[in-house]
């Protein structure tokens, strides 16, 4: 069952109104998608953060706008990099019976023997596109790296299959690898030339 999220419809999108909302701890946003035109809304910042923390980034939330109930996903959000606060959210209205596509984080699990042997673990892909009905969207996809030795690679083909969703990614794209450690360069030393021998005067002294 979708978690309820309280939103308020915004009557204006003027900059002064947006500034006022943010000063009150609210985040301006927009709802669009299934059976919904672009509707400007606002949501309490702390309530939204708590809802996502408790239910997950890809959870379905139930909202009511103009007396109409909608199921929405947190599709996109913007964060002020200096203040580290939410400044805008996009809520995607969805049909619970229709597939949607969204980003899902790839989480590495296990300990790679190659790392213990001195190799360097490099995760190239951190998120992949996944399609599923809203209630089947995974929060993360786990990729087991416990078999990786130095020089080994895991690709998108190695991501675990699941009947509830489909990973939309190019085949054989590198997700993670364990590379050999860089060899330390030996310091270059230059031998100093040996000093030339100093010869004395071979002439006999004059008496």
UniProtKB/Swiss-Prot annotation:
Gene3D superfamilies from the UniProt entry: Ribosomal protein L25, beta domain, Ribosomal Protein L25, Chain P
Region of interest called Disordered, as start-end residue ranges on this chain: 171-207
Any GO BP annotation: translation
Molecular functions (GO terms): 5S rRNA binding; structural constituent of ribosome
Alphabetic keyword roster: Ribonucleoprotein, Ribosomal protein, RNA-binding, rRNA-binding
This protein's record includes keyword rRNA-binding: yes
The keyword Ribosomal protein is annotated on this UniProt entry: yes
Basic and acidic residues composition bias: residue spans: 196-207
Top-rank taxon: Bacteria
Any Pfam family matching the protein: Ribosomal_L25p
UniProt cross-references to CDD domains, sorted A to Z: Ribosomal_L25_TL5_CTC
GO cellular component, one term: cytosolic large ribosomal subunit
Disulfide bridge map: none
NCBIfam families: bL25_bact_ctc, PRK05618.2-4
Its biological purpose: This is one of the proteins that binds to the 5S RNA in the ribosome where it forms part of the central protuberance.
UniProt family annotation: Belongs to the bacterial ribosomal protein bL25 family. CTC subfamily.
Protein name: Large ribosomal subunit protein bL25
Gene designation: rplY
